[in-house]
Amino acid sequence: MNTTATTVSRGRRPPRTLYRGDPGMWSWVCHRISGATIFFFLFVHVLDAAMLRVSPQTYNAVLATYKTPIVGLMEYGLVAAVLFHALNGIRVILIDFWSEGPRYQRLMLWIIGSVFLLLMVPAGVVVGIHMWEHFR
């Protein structure tokens, strides 16, 4: 029996690694999810725009269905996905191309998280104002 199996069998958890809940792993997962979300939005957006050529009446009907509170919340989610994807993309570029990037990757993750939260608050206010004006 090796020492890792012995350590786990005694109830102690092995050290946290990249694949066991490290913040960098969650950043990677969220980056993939935000990228897929943005791709899905762009796909639907292109289909909607193409609908204008087919039938302007159908296009207007589809746009009317987008004027609901749930779509307003989805817009806020889209802002969050684009903002996180952009900020984390900058962090990934710095890690890959800056010689000191790997050393500061955890600090950069916390900075990205802070900037994300600081920008999402005013974005939430703006989206909330638009929703309030639109749905009252």
UniProtKB/Swiss-Prot annotation:
Q: Name the cofactor(s) required for activity, per the record.
A: heme
Q: Per the UniProt record, which residue ranges are transmembrane?
A: 32-52, 70-90, 109-129
- Give residues annotated as binding heme: H85
> Which PANTHER family does the record associate with it?
SUCCINATE DEHYDROGENASE 2 MEMBRANE SUBUNIT SDHC, SUCCINATE DEHYDROGENASE HYDROPHOBIC MEMBRANE ANCHOR SUBUNIT
Q: Does the keyword Methyltransferase apply?
A: no
The alphabetized UniProt keywords are: Cell membrane, Electron transport, Heme, Iron, Membrane, Metal-binding, Transmembrane, Transmembrane helix, Transport, Tricarboxylic acid cycle
Per its record, what are the GO molecular function terms? electron transfer activity; metal ion binding
According to its UniProt record, what is one Pfam family this protein matches? Sdh_cyt
- Describe the outcome of a gene knockout: Cells lacking the sdh2 operon (sdhCDAB) display a stationary phase exit defect after 60 days in culture. They show only slight difference in intracellular succinate and malate concentrations during aerobic growth or hypoxia when compared to wild-type. The mutant strain is more susceptible to proton motive force (PMF) inhibition than the parental strain, and it was impossible to recover colonies from mutant cultures after 21 days. Cells harboring a deletion of sdh2 consume oxygen at a reduced rate and are able to modulate respiration as dissolved oxygen (DO) is depleted to about 6%.
**Taxonomic lineage from the root:** Bacteria, Bacillati, Actinomycetota, Actinomycetes, Mycobacteriales
InterPro entries documented for this protein? SdhC_prok, SQR/QFR_C/D, Succ_DH_cytb556, SuccDH_FuR_B_TM-su
Q: List the disulfide bonds.
A: none
One annotated Gene Ontology cellular component of this protein: plasma membrane
Subunit and interaction comment: Part of an enzyme complex containing four subunits: a flavoprotein (SdhA), an iron-sulfur protein (SdhB), plus two membrane-anchoring proteins (SdhC and SdhD).
Subcellular localization: Cell membrane
The identity of this protein, by name, is: Succinate dehydrogenase 2 membrane subunit SdhC
Record GO biological process:
tricarboxylic acid cycle
For this chain's record, the cofactor binding note is: The heme is bound between the two transmembrane subunits.
Q: What is its main location?
A: membrane
Keyword Iron in the entry? The reply is yes
Function according to Swiss-Prot or TrEMBL: Membrane-anchoring subunit of succinate dehydrogenase 2 (Sdh2). Sdh2 may catalyze the two-electron oxidation of succinate to fumarate with a corresponding reduction of quinone to quinol under low oxygen conditions, when the primary aerobic succinate dehydrogenase (Sdh1) is inhibited. Sdh2 seems to be the generator of the proton motive force (PMF) under hypoxia.
Q: Which family does it belong to?
A: Belongs to the cytochrome b560 family.
Q: Which Gene3D superfamilies match?
A: Fumarate reductase/succinate dehydrogenase, transmembrane subunit
Protein topology in the membrane = Multi-pass membrane protein
